[in-house]
Amino acid sequence: MADLTAWRALVDKELAGAPFDKLVQRTAEGLAIEPLYVEAPARATRPIGAASFRVCMRARPGEAAEHIDGGADALWLDGDDRDGITLAAKRDVLVVVDRFSTERFVPFEVEPRVVWLGFDPLASGLQLGPKIEQFWQAVSRAMPPFATGEMRNIRVSTLPYHAAGADAADELAIALSTAVAYLRAMNGAASQLWFQISVGRDTFGELCKLRALRVLAAKLFAASSIAAAIPPIHAVTSSRTQAARDPWVNLLRVTTEVFAAAIGGADLVTPLAFDTELAEPSALGRRVARNTALVLRDESYLGRVIDAAGGSYYIESRTDALAREAWQRFRAIERDGGIAKLIASGALQARLDASWATRAAAVAKRNEPVLGVSEFANLDEHLPSAPSGAAHGHRDAEAFEALRAKYASRDVVLVSLGTPAESRARIGFAKALFATAGVRAREAETGQIVCLCGSDDNYAAHAASVAAQLRAAGATKIALAGKPNGTAGVDTYVYVGCDVIVALEELLA
């Protein structure tokens, strides 16, 4: 294309010799995000005529009526909440039921048309380890009573893998391998499958993940000569993105995640309450979460648009790239013996640990910011000192929240080198950085824990001598706000791109 060639020539001119790849971003999966997408759109990946999504609320015993009366048309219940199940059946509300045991599975009488059973032994096995074999035995005993009707009984959930650190491609690969394991283990499983998947912070990446899941499920069924319809998708906003600090920001996180789920083509969407990490979700938290999804569906009309992202070459290209990467990873899992073998051997957990370590490093360096926690921390909020532990697995905010719980009482002094104009920018930077640990840094001439703030020229001329004077005055730890420069007497450096967790642990411990 002539226009594209001309554009590339202008870009190369502006880059002045720098590589074009400087403009190409990389996802956590290593996939390229190009700076410009101009080709003709690809075919949409969501079936034409797909229905609107249901708002599916996670309900504790006694909360079913609250959610139904508030507008929810699906409930996610524990199997023990038989009153909630009965109520939902009477009102034509779809019910997702978590109900299984390592020893036995207890069926219950209810209208088949309203229930999806959350029977997913492999996902549970990630947490239960050796007990996974008991789950396999439970599957064969439990399935016969539910082999007919419109119920869906076999859940393929990536929630525990997402919480453990899986990236999007791994989530999809694990979902496919889990589905294959169930298809092999149980006759007629194809019509009983449904997917449950987390939706995280990357709006475009996450909606592409849901679209890719449909593409991959269709490819898997075609390769297996299965004529069943593609399993429906239950999207759940991510527990990994929830923060205990400045929890009001979770309202915005959940909003973008519900949006991604809706545009990605989810059949059910569960929004988590903004205060999930503080304690059991409050009535306000539950109401706001429910209304967030209802507003997006009914007032913003996301539920009335068929495949809103279809036709965008950017979306279609990212979906295709993610699907291809996930398919390759799925094949690798199968070559290694399948998902059950990887779980039992601990290989999958090791893989997820490595993935989480990469993500945690990006969060620690604030390349992946957590607003209200690693950026723009609120020093005046008064919340429980530790999260409730409601979510299993990891959360993006966990390391910074732990830092704040340990060191919020520390006294940090900022010592200015040079004029106010020369030191103002780095003083502001240092105050914001120490706030992530709950520390209200103050400007003074000396203290036990000190951070030098000034210009590079002033550092070169005065930092070493000032550090020596501070040591003589009783300073035990000295930091410098700037890139490492070998200044004598400085213990650590804080700067944009540094590992904030490591730097503050060294300084505040």
Annotated model-derived regions:
Residues 1-198, 202, 231-232, 268-272, ...:
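Catalytic alpha/beta active-site cores
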Residues 66, 260, 374-381, 433:
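Hydrophobic/aromatic ligand-binding patch that stacks against planar heteroaromatic rings
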Residues 65, 208, 412-440:
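Short, acidic loop-beta-alpha module within alpha/beta folds
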Residues 182, 194-375, 476-484, 492-508:
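Active-site capping/gating regions of soluble enzymes
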Residues 1-8, 14, 18-25, 29-43, ...:
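Intrinsic disorder at enzyme termini
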Residues 441-447:
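Short acidic low-complexity segments
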Residues 68-69, 189-191, 402-410, 445:
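Glycine-rich phosphate/diphosphate-binding loops that line cofactor/substrate pockets in enzymes
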Residues 60-68, 251-258, 426:
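Short, acidic/polar
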